[in-house]
Design a protein with these regions (language model features):
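Short acidic-hydrophobic surface loop/beta-edge motif
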Residues: 70-75, 128
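Active-site-proximal loop/helix segment associated with metal-binding centers of metalloenzymes
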Residues: 78-152, 156-165, 171-173
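Active-site neighborhood of phospho(di)ester-bond hydrolases with catalytic His/Asp-centered motifs
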Residues: 3-12, 39-40, 150-156, 173-175
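Hydrophobic packing residues within well-ordered alpha-helices of enzyme cores
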Residues: 19-22, 47-50, 162
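Binuclear metal-ion centers of metallo-dependent hydrolases, dominated by the metallo-beta-lactamase
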Residues: 68-70, 158-189
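A gly/proline- and charged-residue-enriched helix-loop-helix capping module
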Residues: 42-51, 63-68
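Active-site catalytic pocket residues across diverse enzymes, especially alpha/beta-hydrolases
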Residues: 23-26, 51-54, 98
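Active-site metal-binding motif and surrounding structural segment of the metallo-beta-lactamase
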Residues: 1-38, 62-70
Length: 189
């Protein structure tokens, strides 16, 4: 699937300066769908400054600026949770939680005499109406399963917020640059 959301942790050049090239590449690929950019307050101003070299795009850009220490943003099928981390500028980490539906219960489908041609549609959440019956996903699907969680943070000192937000993550990505004790002062800058 094409990229339709980009989350920015903060606006230091090494984290955002590649955006114009990415936008131009998307435009050259004939993208027309909107692109949502999420990041700390000031995102619109920063991106508009970078767009001097990519002013005309065949798709709209939407902005979501974060101001609170924590945000939860629901989308169809997944959720993004943003949380502040400890950097020398306002900086966010992100958790992406992908929802997972329950398992298809073959025995229930067979017991209800649901024709096989409807099974995959029911698994995808579709309700099937026939002249004789109405079949709904809840008739054949088990309870929702635990979602898949990815947590990402960068350019931060250790914080309780990271521990809290990375809890139960299936994948935790955290960049670290200054691990040696003699570079402790550099890490605090």
């Amino acid at each position: 699937k094409p990229v339709y959301i980009i989350c920015f942790t903060h606006y230091h050049a090494d984290h955002i300066s590649g955006l114009p090239g990415m936008l131009l590449t998307m435009g050259n690929a004939e993208r027309t769908e909107p692109l949502l950019l999420i990041g700390p307050k000031g995102l619109t101003r920063v991106v508009n400054s970078l767009r001097v070299i990519a002013p005309e795009l065949p798709f709209p850009i939407e902005y979501m600026e974060l101001a609170e220490p924590e945000h939860s943003i629901d989308f169809e099928g997944f959720r993004i949770e943003a949380f502040r981390v400890n950097h020398n500028v306002v900086c966010y980490g992100y958790s992406i939680i992908i929802e997972r539906s329950g398992r298809f219960q073959l025995d229930k489908a067979q017991a209800l005499n649901i024709p096989k041609q409807y099974w995959s549609r029911l698994q995808k959440g579709e309700t099937i109406e026939t002249p004789e019956n109405v079949f709904t996903p809840d008739m054949v699907m088990g309870p929702p399963r635990k979602g898949i969680k990815l947590t990402y943070c960068t350019d931060t000192r250790p914080t309780e917020g990271i521990v809290k937000n990375a809890a139960e993550a299936d994948l935790f990505i955290c960049e670290g640059m200054y691990g040696e004790p003699e570079k402790k002062d550099k890490a605090r800058e």
